[in-house]
From Swiss-Prot:
Gene3D superfamilies: Vaccinia Virus protein VP39 (3.40.50.150). This is Ribosomal RNA small subunit methyltransferase G. One of its GO terms (molecular function) is rRNA (guanine-N7-)-methyltransferase activity. InterPro entries: rRNA_ssu_MeTfrase_G (IPR003682), SAM-dependent_MTases_sf (IPR029063). Specifically methylates the N7 position of guanine in position 527 of 16S rRNA.
Length: 217
């Protein structure tokens, strides 16, 4: 079985198991992303997952697991790395707008190449550190699956977090210690245990907001 056929079947069955419906053109873009990731990863070490057969479950389905819980139009992916979860989510939500931020030049060049190659007009890439980032838009949601801790994420993004902004933190095991160490002016307003086909181990999504701003969550 060729790699492309393997990934296509994994993607189709995984989306069905998760109840995520994507048009053929959206699935084609995701498969093209996987092709680019496999190609660039050989030279630039974009992801520690070296086996491309695992990229569908570990990267694509894992990213899309957050899809049912996202609310808003403007999103920021902090520490986007190889474009995860931002690129899969921007493909799945073409009416939304995504800013993908990373301080690693190789990774932002890869994300820019994906944006141009795949035709993703709702995507912009920023090569900078979060502390130096001065956006010209207000974000409804700030998401990350790679930022060190929830506390670090809040500290870095604090100036961007408005009363209505939601932080979406994708984690493995439920991070009890990180939650206990969160700043007092923030709280977990929702949390969800995620089921990701093909992924071993637990996955959780935590939705965090400024304390006292839980309406509409």
């Amino acid at each position: 079985m060729t790699l492309v056929l393997n990934q296509t079947e994994q993607l189709t069955s995984g989306l069905k198991a998760m109840g995520v419906k994507l048009a053929e053109v959206q699935q084609a873009k995701i498969l093209r992303y996987l092709e680019l990731l496999h190609k660039w990863n050989k030279a630039y070490n974009l992801t520690a997952v070296r086996d491309p057969v695992l990229h569908v479950s570990r990267h694509i389905l894992d990213s899309l697991a957050a899809l049912p819980y996202l609310k808003g139009v403007q999103f920021l992916d902090v520490g986007a790395g190889a474009g995860l979860p931002g690129i899969p989510l921007s493909i799945a939500l073409p009416e939304s707008h995504w800013t993908l931020l990373d301080s690693n030049g190789k990774k932002t060049r890869f994300m820019d190449q994906c944006r141009m190659d795949m035709g993703l007009p709702n995507l912009r890439v920023e090569h900078t550190r979060i502390e130096a980032f001065s956006p010209d838009v207000k974000f409804d949601g700030i998401i990350s699956r790679a930022f060190a801790t929830i506390g670090d994420m809040i500290a870095g993004c604090r100036d961007l977090i408005l009363s209505e902004t939601r932080i979406y933190a994708l984690k493995g095991l439920y991070p009890h210690d990180e939650i206990e160490a969160m700043p007092a002016d923030f709280e977990v307003v929702e949390w969800h245990k995620l089921e990701v086909p093909g992924c071993d181990g637990e996955r959780h999504l935590l939705i965090i907001a400024r304390s006292g701003n839980t309406g509409g969550s």
